[in-house]
């Protein structure tokens, strides 16, 4: 899996963070990501809000990742090929979960323009939001947003 290099953003973990059945690993960091062991698999990535299938494939081993890297309430389904019931069926649920929004450092206008949407995202999804940004911007915003955790990258 290629990693993000020379970027202002924090790269996702090298391996998906959630362990599923039969040594399947998945997460929703940087889109939907699934790492499959040797086997005969059928994978579906869906938009959980519209129930539209965004991607579907058969794979023997390796990675399946979404092309969409922005927020989509993904649903991941992994089947053994030929079976109708998914072995793994997970939908992104953010309530009470830690969520990191990584803002680039060295910018002010864009960050101030986008930050109200981060606050709205937290209110909508009821998540534990942490935002990374430059310390001088943290000093400006943190007193106004006590419900958000701030940190430097």
Regions found by a protein language model. Name each.
Residues 1-153:
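Catalytic machinery of carbohydrate-active enzymes
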């Amino acid at each position: 899996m290629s990693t993000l290099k020379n970027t202002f953003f924090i790269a996702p973990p090298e391996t998906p963070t959630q362990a599923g059945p039969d040594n399947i690993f998945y997460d929703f960091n940087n889109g939907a990501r699934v790492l499959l062991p040797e086997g005969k698999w059928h994978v579906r990535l869906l938009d959980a809000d519209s129930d539209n299938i965004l991607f579907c494939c058969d794979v023997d081993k390796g990675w399946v990742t979404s092309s969409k890297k922005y927020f989509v309430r993904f649903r991941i389904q992994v089947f053994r090929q030929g079976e109708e019931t998914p072995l793994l069926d997970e939908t992104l649920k953010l309530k009470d979960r830690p969520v990191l929004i990584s803002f680039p450092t060295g910018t002010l206008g864009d960050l101030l323009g986008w930050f109200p949407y981060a606050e709205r995202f937290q209110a909508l999804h009821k998540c534990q939001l942490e935002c990374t940004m430059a310390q001088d911007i943290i000093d400006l915003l943190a007193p106004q947003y006590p419900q958000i955790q701030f940190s430097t990258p």
